[in-house]
Amino acid sequence: MYNSQQQNIIKINKQDTDGRLQLFIVDAKRTLRNSSIELESSQIYIDVTKRLIDIASLFCKQEEIQYESFAEELLSILNSTQFKILGKCRELVIKLLTIIAKYARVNQLLGIESKDRSPSSSINKNNGFDQLYDFELNRIDENNNNNNNNNNNNNNNNNKNKTISPTHQTIQATIPSPKLQPFLDHDDKDDKEIIDIVSNKDKDQLNGVDDVDLSNTSGISCKEIFEKNPINFQKSHYRCLSYSPKLLEQQLQQKLVNQQIKLKNGKPSPIKRPSPPLPPPQQQQKEQQKEQKEQQKEQQKEQQKEQQKEQEQKQQEPQKYVKFEIQKSPPSNLLPPLPISSSNISNEISKQQQQQQQQQQQQQQQQQQQQQQQQQQQQQQIAQPPPPQSITSPQTISANNNILTTPLSSQPTQSLETPSTIKPPLLSRRVSDIIYSKNETNLNIKEPIHSKDIIPTPLETNVGGGGGEITKKVVGSEENLLSSSSEEETLSTSEEHDEYTTSTSGEDEEEDEDDDNIYNTNHYEISERKLKNKRPFKKTHVHHSLSANSPLSRKPYESPVFLLDPRLNDLKTSSDEYILKRPLVRSKSFSPNKEEEQIKKEPYRKLARSFSEIPSVKLIEDHNDDSQMAMCRICEEPIHSSLLEDHSKICAMANEEDMKAMNVDDHLRAVAKILLTRSNDIPHEKRKMIIELREIALFAVENGIKENLKMIHIMNDIIKNFDPKDDNRELAIKIQSLISDKVNALKRADDVINSSPRIFRTNSPRILKSPREEELSQTPLGGRLRSDSDPVHQTQIEYKPKGVPTISDFEFIKPITKGGYGKVFLAKKIRTGDIYAIKRLKKSDMIKKNQLDHVKVERNILAYTSNPFVVKMYYSFQTKEYYYLVMEYLQGGDCFSLLQMLGSMDENMAKMIIAETVLALEYLHSHGIVHRDVKPDNLLIDKKGHIKLTDFGLSKVGLLDRQTVVPPSYFSPTLSGKNNQSSSSSSVSNIGGSNTIGSNISSTNNNNNNNNTTGATMVGGHVINTETPIPSNTAIPAKKEKKLLSLAQSKSLFSASSSPSIPSLNLLNSDKPISPMMMGVKGFIPPPPINQQPISNIPTTTTTTTTTTTGQQSQQQSQQQQQTTPPLPPHNIHRKLSCVGTPDYLAPEILLGIGHGASADWFSLGVILYEFLCGVSPFNGSSVQETFQNILQRNISWPEDMSPEARDLIDKLLALDPRQRLGFNGAEEIKSHPFFKSINWKTILTQEPYFKPKIENLQDTSYFDPRKEIYKVSDDFAESCKPFVQNQNQNKESSTILTTSPPSTSSTTATATATTSNLDSITINQNTNANFDDFLYVNFQSLLELNKNYLAEAKPFNSNHRRRNST
């Protein structure tokens, strides 16, 4: 039975051996794979390597095996005369022999015998190693072995005494057989070099010891044997470690400093041990040791002078790298060796602990003496390596392994504290490993460190002992080397690989244990890099130039493979500033060359993360598989599905910057138009400068980075020539600023494309599809033609950038529904096949109804927002007559259609819909957006049953403000001195209000705009008020102080003070009593009777130009209104007119014009919830007046079957005072209401909705059928959109265009159509072009989400290749 200390040694020995064997298997497999490519490789090398792998695998799996049989088999391979094993294969054989020898020797020292091993085999277990030793070191004179036997035994006892690192406990064991020493001393060095640097001490060990009685010898640590050959760790092996290599290096450097300090501190007091009775042979050894000590002291005095001289010479020799073999303690021979026993070990540990305390006390007293002797002793140690007699110098080490005492000091030196113990990984890297480090890195040592016990330096060794010294030169031949010259590859690979992979990430440094599937090109790169550098390794005072050519690789010198990669030619940047920034992806090597690709034939990477894993473009084209190709929605080019994710990111970045440059071009064209107008009104002297500015603006539109950089410098001189008071100077500054913005955008797009791998590159419309220079030179300066997307500015250059949407890119399938200002069509993108919903609005109607600002507001909100409960917009563009919004198509219809089919909803279904609507409104309010038109019609349902909010035409984000707040817009038509905008005077808000509900209610359709009709205002398609007739060609200028702000600027301008005006309705003239809740509203004054109220106090309609003040006229108007207004149908019939604004959902503050904010949306939400549960609006009336009166007086009928929670929520949402309304302080008030107790707000998007539409295909519009029946929308696309088809084919609009009027007013359709045809088309076109110059937009983030959705829905791409850092 073994004690706990011996069991720990056995466990550590097995772990260390298994780790070394695993690394050996990986190295052998890599060699086997690479040797199959070499032309000079023979089959015997492959067979031997495979056998070595099998032996290592078998040895690693078993705990106790007959390792002697493996040693004999490996020795037979080395001694084979038929097959001469050389090069890397020979190195592997010796490496495996070394591992097995270390494992076997530790077991021998512990007295371990295998269960299956007989006594006879135990006696002859070193025969195989003896044969190898005789075979490799036949030049060493063996005649002197018997003469120096006793002397060398003493030397071995002095040099073998180590501690166990996991437990810091000392185990004394027997001396190993000397013929096993070549494998135990084998340190991955060139064998010839090993023989050359053997010292006298080592030679005495090899020649003077043969078969030693293991039971009678001790003094050597087992750990010293199985750790003597350190592993040369590489970066690729760090996966096996659980701690940082940098931390390990710091630990080793600290131990180096401690060891050097201890050696400088003089001779400590020896540790006294119990001396048991010694056998006669050991007593003789002790006497011999005393004699040798006396001789050593005399020789040291004689050699001091020589050491000082040699020190000066060797300090001048340059040493770039110093190789250290770190040992935890120097050897000691103060006391005679003790046999292994548990009692001796325990006694030794207790004595050592006591000695340690004494040493710590003595250390404090001797610190001053140590500082004085430190410099002198350091120079002596560096100057001269230890003489042969130095091996008998008495040294001892304490059991704590932190106190080291030497003969030079009588006091111990306490070492620095080591970091906390880390759990050993699969392969333990110990402190005896070899490290290559520069001298500058060790800041604690002023001079290079040369330890006498690390690497012996004499090239001449003394054979013999005592007084007789026989000098013999150690010479080795190439045939008798322990390993071939290719062992240099192991050293160089370790160092070069460390240097080369310093900048790579941790994931790329890992390697799989199963190297058969590794797509590795580092072997070729490292070998070429090694041949290029050819730097010799310097190991202390021995300088040997290692051969660079290995037997298995005799290729001529070539440049590194990654520098020959042709894809490097494509990696160009516009300036040196961006050289260090590329590539975007993390890469440590480029892809292999064409020859390696033909050999590998590996499939593509699933997601390539570095150049070494990116297949070439040619390989993609050769293996083009339509089933694995996907269409990128951004650049609309096919790309492999495995690369779509990374490509989409780069594509979106490049195209977004390119689109910014295109928008700058639009502004430059607008400025050029302004300059053209101004040039007609100024004197001839200044006209030349204005024309020059216009030419520069148009020149900047058509050219790229280099030309525009020149224009910026030219503009500096032009601006200086302008008078500071000249208005044109501001335009010149604006032109220069726009050109600079364009150059910056193009640079960013160019950098994104050029710094990305070619396989990921995008087809940016401007970078890769720019017009040719020849066409530009032959064409006069002017704006380019952007097809239908920009028909205003036309030149002879018919250039349509790729990626810019136009109407010809879509195939219209059928109409879906129509609203107050346009229609919605189902369309398909021809190139990608995606289905969209396209909202088409006629420009002339937008101008006449003063809705241009609302259209842009809706576009900006859709472009700005990104939320799962808000409809996404992908494109916005225009033609000569129409404006288009391309949005996502939601097949589930809207809540209005759903309510029409169900009549009313279940409370749980309504709760889910309202909850998702609350999240949508919360998102909008957090971004300063008030929807102001929340109703069931605008709540769309997707294919999964979730809600999305749409129709932001009436929304308010503070986008309208006075001109003093915003800088002037240089492309506004008002700067030309003329105002050709034709529009009706919209309702004016109190403070900077927007024309929203008021204009919506007061806007009349084309049916009512004829020359003979009066200024009637339509609400729900019915005449509300009549005024003085207005000619159709009368143009009332809009207010100049109103200006459209960008969405980013408008975020900070959100206010709740604006409200639209209300048409002149007798809202408060009713016989019903005023609600007592209205009396509590602050600032509320009961209105006087209608016959006493001045008519001037009633807001007028937007189409009136004169008002009357007499009571008779007001009474006549009321009578005329009653005569012309037919009775309203029931609620489910007049609800179909909500497209032009249904008053059922208007908040009281909007009707009263006292200012409104986000609370108006919560009021509408309460109305919707009531309508979902009851099937009818809470304020429904037989007329619009009655509906408004019900809202202001809060006349609500509560059904009996409504739950108390629902009633309480509706009651609080319908509060008349906005400050008392639920949600005034935020959406959390609503979300915390008991009605939503069962709602999980965090996971609501993943919950199963109560209504999930059943869709036959992506083009299914069956859930919009109720709206089609109400609006009488025909499914026949040719019939319902005949004028539109003619516009596509003939580029002109028919005069009989389909109007947006409700079907109930069909009697006036013909008249309205005739009126539209008589409009001044020239004026309308001018105004349209002026207000839609900058309308083109592509939402690249939404398109990026389409690519991600495609990857999520499509089947994942399965590759046979496993990435290097995959687990």
From Swiss-Prot:
EC number: 2.7.11.1
Broad enzyme group: transferase
Region (Disordered): 140-164, 264-429, 456-556, 771-792, 971-1034, 1084-1134, 1288-1312
UniProt biased composition (Low complexity): 143-162, 340-381, 979-1015, 1092-1125, 1294-1312
Catalysed reaction equations from the record: L-seryl-[protein] + ATP = O-phospho-L-seryl-[protein] + ADP + H(+); L-threonyl-[protein] + ATP = O-phospho-L-threonyl-[protein] + ADP + H(+)
Compositionally biased region (Basic and acidic residues): 287-326
Residue stretches of biased makeup (Acidic residues): 506-517
Catalytic residues in the record: 933 (proton acceptor)
Binding residues for ATP: 816-824, 839
Basic residues bias locations: 531-544
Span of domain AGC-kinase C-terminal: 1237-1347
Biased composition (Polar residues): 399-421, 1025-1034
Stretches assigned to the Protein kinase domain: 810-1236
Alphabetical list of SMART domains matching this protein: S_TKc
GO molecular function, one term: protein serine/threonine kinase activity
Pfam family, one: Pkinase
A Gene Ontology biological process term: intracellular signal transduction
SUPFAM superfamilies per UniProt: Protein kinase-like (PK-like) (SSF56112)
Comp. bias (Pro residues): 271-282
Family according to the record: Belongs to the protein kinase superfamily. AGC Ser/Thr protein kinase family.
Descriptive protein name: Probable serine/threonine-protein kinase pkgA
